[in-house]
Amino acid sequence: LTIHTVMENMVVGILLIFALQWLFLGNLRSAIIVAATIPFALAFAILILVLQGESANLLSVGALDFGLVVDACVIMVENIFRHMVERSAAAENGQGRYTMASRFGAVLGASSEVSRGIFFAAAIIIASFLPLFTLTGVEGHIFGPMAKTYAYAITGGLIATFTVAPVLATL
């Protein structure tokens, strides 16, 4: 397993997530927004690992599951775009104009609808990795960094879901 192989697999994973998001939601913009959160989450995880003195090695970073990382963002972005379509349709039916303010309102409305569920789902996933933080010995050296990488990447994905995704959707 080389760094080249891991990087290659990461790129393929991001492209697959992008393609599936675009295929199933039928919205190129939402696919781009979801794909944009992956580098943020990965950088966040590696930064936290390095700041803690941990090694962001091939085993820990290579084990990442981007599906878990972007899960919350997919839900948020889909709900935001659903709200935007509803507001746009209302504007076309003569119920006001569709402006930047109405886009912002759609983002706020959509975010408030799903934020608790997204937060608690991510918290449960992160909590499932916490026992692995305390392992000692060989197991701790193998599974500890992997668990931390997962937890930090999901936390980074959650931060991106509540910050990066709504801003990009508003533009």
Enumerate the predicted regions with their spans:
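Hydrophobic regular secondary-structure detector
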Residues: 1-171
